[in-house]
């Protein structure tokens, strides 16, 4: 339940796959609003990316517990066998959003207290983390893949770091584009989408690398060797046939 059949190598594979191969922003284009709005300066993009990664990691872990112990059909059986037939799955999305919104509010209070400059730089986009579809999408992706708890934590961390990496790279490029001779009709949104598309194509080059699946069975060649090997002769060579 907590680790399942996943090894440490599989956990590393899940992290790399969520960060690079299946980057939640560049492969599914979730969270594009804040990605485009808060990437004009590298410092602001870095702060927002760090916040999204933190919120996604913690809320992904909490929502996994919500799914398996509250909203999943039969999840309440751990409280009492009489509650095994209760199905609260219709409340799942609402509870996921409530958890994300609550933790976002906590993060907003902490940033206002300890990082006033970042709090002012993010502005209205900080409370909008609560409705950032990348966070809810990362949670739902992990739940639908039936990850155990630790792989879910690693997947949430990788998805958050992938979004963070994408917005930091994009902010770096946008700072360079500010001093470039971009055609007038492509300035602003046009060159931003072109740049994002080229970044997505670059990350697609890693497609095919997959070490995230658990190995629950022996390799095929081991099975073939076991089945093709000659069976030992159980009859003694000195045994004579019986007379009819």
Swiss-Prot record:
Presence of keyword Cell membrane: yes
GO biological process, one term: respiratory electron transport chain
The protein's enzyme class: translocase
Cellular component terms per the entry's GO annotation: Gram-negative-bacterium-type cell wall; plasma membrane
Extent of Polar residues compositional bias: 222-236
Subcellular location, principal: membrane
Keywords for the protein's UniProt record, in alphabetical order: Cell inner membrane, Cell membrane, Ion transport, Membrane, NAD, Sodium, Sodium transport, Translocase, Transmembrane, Transmembrane helix, Transport, Ubiquinone
Keyword check for Transport: yes
Reactions performed catalytically: a ubiquinone + n Na(+)(in) + NADH + H(+) = a ubiquinol + n Na(+)(out) + NAD(+)
EC numbers: 7.2.1.1
Bilayer topology: Multi-pass membrane protein
TM ranges: 11-31, 50-70, 90-110, 123-143, 153-173, 191-211
Superkingdom classification of source: Bacteria
Localisation per UniProt entry: Cell inner membrane
A GO MF label: oxidoreductase activity, acting on NAD(P)H, quinone or similar compound as acceptor
Pfam families: Rnf-Nqr
Region (Disordered): 222-244
Description of how the protein assembles with itself and partners: Composed of six subunits; NqrA, NqrB, NqrC, NqrD, NqrE and NqrF.
Function: NQR complex catalyzes the reduction of ubiquinone-1 to ubiquinol by two successive reactions, coupled with the transport of Na(+) ions from the cytoplasm to the periplasm. NqrA to NqrE are probably involved in the second step, the conversion of ubisemiquinone to ubiquinol.
PANTHER family assigned: INTEGRAL MEMBRANE PROTEIN OF SOXR-REDUCING COMPLEX (PTHR30335), NA(+)-TRANSLOCATING NADH-QUINONE REDUCTASE SUBUNIT E (PTHR30335:SF1)
Protein family (similarity comment): Belongs to the NqrDE/RnfAE family.
Protein name (record): Na(+)-translocating NADH-quinone reductase subunit E
């Amino acid at each position: 339940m907590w680790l399942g059949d996943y090894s440490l190598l599989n956990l590393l594979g899940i992290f790399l796959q969520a960060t690079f191969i299946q980057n939640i922003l560049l492969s599914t284009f979730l969270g594009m609003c804040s990605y485009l709005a808060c990437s004009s300066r590298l410092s602001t993009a870095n702060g927002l990316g760090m916040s999204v990664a933190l919120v996604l990691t913690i809320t992904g872990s909490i929502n996994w517990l919500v799914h398996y112990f509250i909203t999943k059909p039969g999840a309440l059986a751990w409280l009492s066998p009489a509650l095994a037939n209760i199905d609260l799955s219709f409340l799942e999305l609402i509870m996921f959003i409530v958890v994300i919104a609550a933790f976002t509010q906590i993060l907003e209070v902490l940033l206002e207290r300890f990082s006033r400059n970042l709090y002012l730089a993010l502005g209205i986009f900080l409370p909008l983390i609560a409705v950032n579809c990348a966070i809810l999408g990362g949670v739902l992706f992990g739940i639908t893949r039936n990850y155990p708890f630790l792989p879910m934590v690693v997947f949430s961390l990788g998805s958050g770091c992938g979004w963070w990496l994408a917005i930091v790279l994009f902010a770096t490029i946008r700072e360079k584009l500010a001093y470039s001779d971009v055609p007038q009709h492509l300035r602003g949104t046009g060159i931003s989408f072109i740049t994002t598309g080229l970044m997505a194509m670059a990350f697609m080059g890693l497609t095919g690398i997959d070490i995230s699946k658990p190995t629950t069975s022996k390799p095929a060649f081991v099975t073939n060797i076991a089945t093709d090997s000659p069976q030992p002769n159980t009859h003694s060579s000195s045994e004579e046939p019986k007379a009819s």
